């Protein structure tokens, strides 16, 4: 959707770039419930959000690496819509199964208060402060990069590789060029190679391959 708009309408449209809002569960959980990938996905989403054309909106908790809230009972859910669906689901399944189904899509996940208690399961086990800091640092770095170079704001947008599990695009303005290489899947992939470019930011470590959900930013020398 976003690629089609940016490609077909160019400077005639201005997108709002966001993943989360008060009416949906956290995007990272929509992509996968496998916690081992959550940190990488959060960083990947941040890279795309801060380098695509449009105005980025950071929803509360994105910058801290929050995931869906760990509700343990339907009594904790105040969302009227969720309660209505729960009652409907209970007519054809057990309350336990109905509750599981509600948790997948309820907007309650992004309406709870920010969990200041570091022991809450919204954070990764045993790495609360480290994980939160890493995600925050990624946002700080990318926001600084965006503020320092208007290429990320007003630059042209060109898709270099658009596959189901790979997204490579370029931003260019007045001779300046940046290439973003994004692995949208779990499989390790060969890194994008561009002559005359240097990698100025990466969410991974290996030089020749992209790890699961890794993203890199290349700058023209």
Question: Which ranges hold each PLM region?
Answer:
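Short, basic/hydrophobic alpha-helical segments
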Residues: 5
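Charged, E/D/K/R/S-rich low-complexity terminal regions of large eukaryotic assembly subunits
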Residues: 184-185, 194-195, 213-216
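C-terminal beta-strand-rich structural cap/linker in extracellular carbohydrate-active enzymes
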Residues: 206-221
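Residues immediately flanking
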Residues: 21, 184, 220
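Glycine-rich, flexible loop/turn motifs
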Residues: 15, 23, 110, 153, ...
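Beta-strand-rich binding/interaction modules
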Residues: 187-203
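Active-site clefts of carbohydrate-active enzymes
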Residues: 12-35
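Loop/helix patches that line or flank the sugar-binding groove of alpha-linked glycan CAZymes
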Residues: 2, 10, 33-178, 184-189
């Amino acid at each position: 959707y976003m690629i089609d708009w940016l490609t077909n309408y160019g400077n005639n449209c201005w997108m709002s770039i966001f993943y989360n809002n008060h009416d949906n569960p956290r995007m990272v959980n929509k992509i996968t419930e496998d916690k081992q990938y959550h940190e990488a996905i959060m960083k990947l989403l941040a890279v795309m959000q801060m380098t695509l054309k449009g105005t980025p909106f950071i929803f509360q908790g994105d910058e801290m690496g929050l995931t869906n809230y760990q509700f343990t009972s339907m009594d904790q859910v105040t969302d009227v819509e969720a309660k209505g669906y729960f009652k409907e689901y209970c007519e054809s399944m057990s309350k336990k199964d109905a509750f599981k189904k509600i948790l997948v899509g309820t907007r309650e996940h992004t309406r709870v208060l920010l969990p200041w208690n570091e022991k809450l399961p919204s954070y990764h086990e045993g790495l609360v402060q480290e994980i939160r800091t890493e995600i925050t640092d990624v946002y700080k770095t990318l926001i600084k990069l965006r503020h320092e170079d208007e290429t990320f704001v007003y630059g042209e947008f060109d898709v270099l590789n658009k596959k189901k599990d790979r997204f490579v695009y370029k931003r260019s303005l007045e001779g300046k060029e940046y290439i973003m290489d994004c692995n949208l899947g779990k499989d390790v992939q060969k890194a994008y190679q561009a002559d005359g470019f240097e990698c100025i930011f990466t969410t991974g470590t290996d030089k020749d391959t992209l790890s699961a959900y890794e993203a890199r930013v290349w700058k023209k020398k």
